[in-house]
């Protein structure tokens, strides 16, 4: 392992399992056959400490410029001076450090130690070890989630810790909200999507509004689609959650991804009266006539006989430009459950707007045949 910080440059090699003294001035134990090598390149002449374990005993060696020096006060002072920075920067011995601190000071003590760490890699190791050691419930893990959101800046390391929590702790709605809040400053669409997927797959009680709020931070239409489709597939969404998710779909940039989300939504829930307005607003946000047709054809299959849905669909069709796609949508509604008498004027108006005589004739002919049945 190599790292540098404020002019300090170190090479560190660890073999085996290591524990340090509580004050981080020395190595307390090292698994048999293990070794720790620290080489400081910060000065013109490098200094090296080698600690080895054999037959239950530790041996220490000190080198300056490659030449062996006695293990004296200078050597011990060098180790004691550099070890705190080394341990807190690299995360060496994280599991044993967390165990020792947790046994003496509890969760608060470990969180205080995490505040002293010098990087997100080390923080990740400590957070993961704490979660494994403490065996939190949903309420108990909230301070940890808050500290993750406050202290971690690396999206990758933060996501790794959050996923570990989701896999170890059964989160209730409040805990899931704290989890999502811990993601608030993440910028990587991939890491946000992965963290949300793991949360939903874990069986946590996730509020749909919270998911929709998190989705608003995701710029990638692909990543947003994956999250929204997973949220839709979970079922048991409140009306308000459905409205929020549909608003999230409307804000997507890709017509393909938006169409995929709306199609999944229709297949799962249909178009219920309380969400009709946000649903069709999302459909109208689709610029591609082909993608609109895909969604509205699915609507026709699911709720094609509903008068209000027919009228909203025909209004949307009238704003499209492709005669073929418009005709196919109108035919899908005719084939589904027929056209409601109250919706017939809107249907005929949409058909008459077709510039293609061929498409107009086949749509109106289908209407006449359906009415004769």
Language-model segments: residues:
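Non-catalytic all-alpha helical scaffold/repeat segments
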Residues: 1-373
